């Protein structure tokens, strides 16, 4: 178990400590459950009313909440960012593997860097290159000529197909498959003809990929994930997709082939993105967004019907089905109004 002094926390977060610099913490906890030895944080001012009852050893807050803290206070610019840094420093998550398991199958010509760990029943095929401090969990498969950079970690049962390239400091969760064939077929008189997927997948540095996500290899060019991208669980990323630097994609999202997503984009959960389109840098798509055409300007985009009671939703759905009929009736009314405007009144009989 890692233990840190509050002085060390101040160094890690860049914050200003008000209190005992020698006090010790060993874990992070939510404000309402924190006890002695815990560090907690306040990022939303509406919860400041609970500060007085908090029992944590130290609370990370902004300047405006410091006087409300009943114990040691660590004043930081962004308490949530500070929480992330402290959680990393105190992280006690076990490693997927230690050393090289006797049951691991490793090709004779595979190149392993210093301090590599490979778990039980993992398979490392011919021509694979693993950088320094790489960790391969139990049951992983690393295909021929794949390359993994320094400090990259794979949890159990990750599959990396042949010639896939993964950068340094990446983290891939269990069940993810990278480099399977893209969905490429030609149709000749009703018969499907498979198109060999001759490209690969290139993943940059500091990329994190959640559990059971699939990233397909390119048909001719590569599928590309740039540096600092974070990808949640259970996404489908099709062949030749390109995801730009620093983007974040939430769970359940499906991206069709050859779409290009810009830098610093945020894609909400369960979104569906059409193929062969481009999304500009800095675009945010809210959850369950359906993107059918390119987005050329940064900003926030939404689609779909927000949650309603079932009764309200049924009424809304009924209205949606009547839109075409209502449109026709409206056009007919507009035409009648136009015709009535063109008819001039006959005032000759009034004299």
Curated annotation (Swiss-Prot):
UniProt pathway: Bacterial outer membrane biogenesis; LPS lipid A biosynthesis
List its EC numbers.
2.3.1.191
Reactions the enzyme catalyzes? a UDP-3-O-[(3R)-3-hydroxyacyl]-alpha-D-glucosamine + a (3R)-hydroxyacyl-[ACP] = a UDP-2-N,3-O-bis[(3R)-3-hydroxyacyl]-alpha-D-glucosamine + holo-[ACP] + H(+)
The cysteines joined by S-S bonds are none
Say yes or no: keyword Lipid biosynthesis present.
yes
Superkingdom is Bacteria
Q: According to its UniProt entry, what is the function of this protein?
A: Catalyzes the N-acylation of UDP-3-O-acylglucosamine using 3-hydroxyacyl-ACP as the acyl donor. Is involved in the biosynthesis of lipid A, a phosphorylated glycolipid that anchors the lipopolysaccharide to the outer membrane of the cell.
On assembly, the entry states:
Homotrimer.
Q: What is this protein called?
A: UDP-3-O-acylglucosamine N-acyltransferase
Organism this protein belongs to: Vibrio cholerae serotype O1 (strain ATCC 39315 / El Tor Inaba N16961)
Upper taxonomic lineage: Bacteria, Pseudomonadati, Pseudomonadota, Gammaproteobacteria, Vibrionales
